[in-house]
Amino acid sequence: MDIEALEFRAACLQAARNFFIGRGYLELDTPALSPALIPESCLEVFRTEYLKPFKTGEEAAVPLFLVPSPEVFIKPVIAAHGRSVFQLSKCYRNCESVGHIHSPEFTMLEYYTMQADYRDSIKITEDFLQTMAQAVAGLPLADPELGAVLSKPFLQLTMDEAFKRFAGFSLAEAETPDLAAHAERLGLGGRAQYESWEWDDLYELLLVHCIEPQLPSDVPVALLDYPARVPCLAQERSEQRTAADGRTYIWKTKERWEVYVRGVELANCYTEARDAEEINRSFADEAAI
């Protein structure tokens, strides 16, 4: 890595720290190794072991994991002390392709804000990206066009609005056969091949192959209010609506958003779920997969 790249990275890390420390967040530095992780079936992890000195047999080796996120250590700190916190952490995820977007080892910024919800965090993240763009603007490796994009307010679309705009139908009104029909209409294969697919599988297919590629590239885009049919540990909201045919229905969403810049997902945020039974049930379901 050349000196310009090292200076650019150092400036980014320092600007990130300045942003959150200046707003009263406590910086954490948690371990990279953990004896247990939060169950997430979508992630492959790195496993290793600690070899105890002067021990033999079953007691000699202690299984450990490289953390895919510092969340497992951050949340106990929040629960114990009630502080807004952030961390710039090395994270490790197995089975990742290696390229300019993905890597098995990468640096993640994770922050938690007390007395705030997911919409508050949109503004915080918007301010953060604008601050970062300004902080590195004069460096040789800074991309002026990307800096101009990051300096703009987010375009905010609910997931239902995004499907209406880019796929031509209301996600809120669509059942599983409807999603299969729309996938066929949009050139994603024949309906027959989706006979065994669930609603969330078809939703993911349409999101990845139809919605995400059409998101504007000249402004950061925040997709929010994800369908509750897609499990995640976020607060749930319910809204009574009237369909085009006059029937009323309840549209359930999760207080979640993701931000895309030039088609790449940069950030993911929840209003954290607080129901202990829901959280324990989710952990059990994930661990069973």
Tell what function each PLM region has.
Residues 42-45, 50-59, 124, 136-150, ...:
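Contiguous N-terminal and early-domain "leader" segments and peripheral loops that mark the onset or edge
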Residues 7-15, 23, 28, 68-73, ...:
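Generic recognition of stable, solvent-exposed alpha-helical segments in well-folded globular domains
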Residues 77-78, 100, 234-236, 270-272:
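Short conserved micro-motifs at the rims of enzyme active sites and ligand-binding pockets
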Residues 34-39, 94-96, 229-233, 241-242, ...:
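Flexible loop/turn segments at secondary-structure boundaries
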Residues 98, 133, 278-280:
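A short, polar/proline- and glycine-enriched secondary-structure boundary/capping micro-motif
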